[in-house]
Amino acid sequence: MGDDLDAWAEACDRLAALGRRLGDDDFPGNEADRADGVAHVVEQTLCWLGWSVFHADPRRPSFQRQNDLITQWGGPNADNVYRHARVEPGRRYRVRGRMHSCQEFILAIRAGFMHLPTWGTLVEITASELGIAEGDEFDFVVGEGGQVPLPDGALTVSIREYYFDWSEAEPALFTIECLDDDAGEPPARRTAAATAAQLREGIDGVAHSAEYWNTYMREKAAEGVANTFAPAFALDKGLDAARYSFCFWDLDPDDALVVEVPVPPARYWTFQLYELAWFELVDVADRLSSLNHTQAPVGGDDVIRLVLSHTDPGVANWLDASGRRTGLLTYRAFWTTGEVPTPTTRIVPVAEVAAAMPTGTALLDAAGRAAQMTARRRHLAWRFRT
C-alpha cells in the first residue's frame, strides 16, 4: 500500500483502540456516560480530521467552526462561536466580514490547541480594541504592517464570537485570505505523503483530545472539594481576559445547590454546566445549562443567586443538572477590573429552595420556563444556522 493508505489504516486502528479505551476504569463507567463518550469520539474525529485534512494549507485559509452544537472539546463557552484558520508566520492575511448581532469577539493568535503538545496564546485583541462594534463591517490585516501581529510559532488565527443576549438575529460573518503573491497560484494536486501526514496529525488530535480532557477533568476534580467553588484562576498560556472558577457537583436527585456571589468587577460573567470526562456543555439547546450577566436577574443587594438541581425549583436563575449526579459548574468572569470573588454554596432540599432564598427572588413558572427554552433554541438556530 501507499503511505496514504497505510496512514488511513493506522487511523482506523487507532480509532478502534480509542473506542476500547473508553471502557477502562479511568473513564466514566455507567452506560449513559459511555454512550456519550462514543458520540464524543465521533465528534472529535469529525473535528480534528477535518481540521488537519481540509484546513492544512496556510496559503488557502478558511475558518473552521468548532465547539458548536457538535464538535465540542475543552469546555466551550455557551455564549461563543469558535473559528480557527491555519496560518503561517511571515505571511499576511486579510480578515473581513460583518458583526451583525455579534457583540464582541476575541481574536487570538495561537501556537496550537490546548490538548496538543504545543499550544498557547501569542496575541490577544478584541473587536472593541480594533474599533469594531455590533453591526459593523470590518476589514483588517494580520501580519507585517497590519493591525494584528503574526509572531513566530503562530499556527492559527482563532476567533471567539460573543453573543450575550441570545437574540434571534443574524450572527457574524468572517472571511480570511492570504495576501502573499504565491497565494494566487493554484495548489498542486494532493500527494500520498501530504495526505498521510494530514491523517496522522488529525488522528493525533482525536486521541490527544479524548485522553487530555479526561485526565484534566479528573485532576481538577481531585484538587477541589465537591459542591464547592475553587478560587478564580487565570489559565497559563490562555486568554488574559479570562478568569475561571470550578465547582464539581455531586447531587442526589432531591438536592439543590444554592450558589451566591457578589457581582464581580467584570464586563461579562457566566455560569455553565459541563459533562465530566468529555468536557462538553450539558445539552445547551434542550437543558438550561448556562446563564450569563444579561440573562440572570441579580438581587437588590448586588448578589448573584442561582440554583443547580435536577428538577426545576421555580426560581428564575436555575441551572438544570439534567439527572447527572456529577458534573462541572464553571463560573467565568471576563475583562475584570479587580479581584473576582469566590462563590459560596450550600445544599438544601429542592423542595425547600423557595424558603431558602431572600424575599424578592425572581421566580419563573412552567410557562415562563418553556418560553425561556424556546427562545434559547431559536437563538441557537440562528447562531449555528449552517
Where are the regions that the model predicts?
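A compositional/structural signature for long, glycine/proline-rich flexible linkers
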Residues: 1-386
